[in-house]
Amino acid sequence: MINLTVKIAIDGPAGAGKSTVAKKLAKLLGFTYIDTGAMYRAITLKVLRENISLEDEERIVEVARKSDISLDGERVFLDGEDVSEEIRKPIISQKVSVVSQIPEVREILVKKQRKIAEGKNVVMDGRDIGTVVLPDAQFKFFLTASLEERARRRYEELKNKGTEVKYEEVLEEIKKRDSLDSGRKTSPLTIPEGAILIDTTDLTEEEVVERVYEAIRKNTKGEI
């Protein structure tokens, strides 16, 4: 019996398997899944749609402030429109790190993310969940994998969706995202204090979910 809300934070770089593991874990536990990366992608999509320069931080912040982003399971809605597929396009992946490193944008979205998580048992994944968004989360995990494996996964994902892309291009894109994510001034990608580190390079999705689930059960004496 869960008497208080449980927060599970899953962080890690691009292609480490965060979203896949978080979705499966949330389903297994019956928790709400919150994809914070999708929220940054939604803002990026709107910025590109409105032909706003990525250097115009003031207008980008205004977009973040005025946009209505809601999540329903794995579906993402921007101002009432389902943009779940559109935000996964390569052009969004290429630009999202530029938008997400703007401090005011992060501040606005962190508030939205905390509000969504209020009063719920949640599994939230992103790049600053255990450090900034939910620093008091009872469970923190940091997933990682080799650069080559992360690029391979993203390449396969795009290929399966019918997107024409070269592996080398995906590899370069992930290198750039790693650099931006780790080097940004606000909420850089770091391993949260007390987080359980899992290298997913040679593990299947199911094996990672099992490790996370067992760690949670062990620390709650099987109550979850």
Swiss-Prot record:
Short name of one Pfam family: Cytidylate_kin
Enumerate the GO terms in the molecular function aspect. ATP binding; CMP kinase activity; dCMP kinase activity
Reactions catalysed according to its record: CMP + ATP = CDP + ADP; dCMP + ATP = dCDP + ADP
Catalytic class of the enzyme? transferase
**Record GO biological process:** nucleobase-containing small molecule interconversion; pyrimidine nucleotide metabolic process
- Entry binding sites for ATP: G12, P13, A14, G15, A16, G17, K18, S19, T20
Q: What is its EC number?
A: 2.7.4.25
Where does it localize? Cytoplasm
Q: Which domain of life is it from?
A: Bacteria
What does UniProt give as GO cellular component?
A: cytosol
Cited SUPFAM superfamilies = P-loop containing nucleoside triphosphate hydrolases (SSF52540)
Q: Which UniProt keywords apply?
A: ATP-binding, Cytoplasm, Kinase, Nucleotide-binding, Transferase
Q: HAMAP family, alphabetically?
A: Cytidyl_kinase_type1
The UniProt similarity line reads:
Belongs to the cytidylate kinase family. Type 1 subfamily.
Q: Which PANTHER family match?
A: CYTIDYLATE KINASE, CYTIDYLATE KINASE/PANTOATE-BETA-ALANINE LIGASE
Protein name, entry field: Cytidylate kinase
Q: What is the lineage of its organism?
A: Bacteria, Bacillati, Bacillota, Clostridia, Thermoanaerobacterales
